[in-house]
Amino acid sequence: MKTRGIRNQSWWSGRVFLLGVLVVIAGEWGLTVEGSQAIQLESYAEKEANLKDQARDGLFNRWTFDQQKSDEAPIGFSMLGFGEGPAADWMVKGDREAPSGANLLAVNSSCQATTCYRLIVANGFQYEYPDVSVRMRFPLDAAAGVGGVVFGVRDATHFYAVVVNLAAKTLDISRVVDGKELRLAQAPILPKATPWHTLRIQRNTIISKDFIETFFDGKFVVTAEDQSLAIGQVGLLIRGQNSLHFDNLHAIPLFSQRPLSAPAAY
């Protein structure tokens, strides 16, 4: 019995020591966050509150633009601009070749700067860990087609962007914070030989790590870790001087992936 008591005491002492080490490491990590990510992150209480708010039917959305009139601006969306230059023209257009069957969302930008982002975001919906997909059709001159999706949008100077450059056959993940753009990842893509392409992004989390996964034409492309921005709007973007067509924009919350409590100390 005495030997067993000594062993139990040693076992508990080891666990207490390990817990202390993890607490110290966590504290040091919180003090050494890079300046580029020095934004106040969510507490676990805030994470849980946001999770409960995300589990709402209203966040399961699909926009086909088929119920709107042609040659009008899309209803329920706001336009934002990042970078100098004129605003983009976002317009619903009738097209029998649209994936949804009737209408599509056309955008034309005359902004010549390659760092010129023109956004359109869905009003009234806030996603923290979104799963967003959209169909995209690039112009015949693919050299002029650069665009994609945005999420975590707080305003015109705070958002994440996943951008496809069909001519260069690349996909970029970028972050804009306080108007400063940072590329988080870039990878090549293999577009299918079809007019319409599919872009999908998922923002997910594992314990304390937030990461972004991207897919193009049904294939995984690249992932990036970042947690600078939290909950925000979702939408579409066009970059530089070009035109694009969008259809079948889907957005749902990945709330089932969220942890409800702090990670265990072992």
Task: Give each language-model segment a name.
Residues 108-172:
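Secretory/extracellular carbohydrate-interaction modules
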Residues 41-50, 228-266:
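Ligand-recognition surfaces built from glycine- and aromatic
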Residues 69-106, 116:
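Extracellular glycan-recognition surfaces and repeat-rich motifs
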Residues 1-12:
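N-terminal secretory signal peptides that target proteins for export/translocation
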Residues 177-198:
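Short, aromatic/His-centered strand-loop micro-motif at the edge of beta-sheets
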Residues 40-83, 257-266:
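Extracellular carbohydrate-recognition regions
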Residues 65, 132-134, 195-206, 212-214:
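Short tryptophan-centered beta-strand motifs in secreted/extracellular beta-sheet-rich domains
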Residues 213-235:
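Short, solvent-exposed beta-strand-to-loop segments that form ligand-recognition rims
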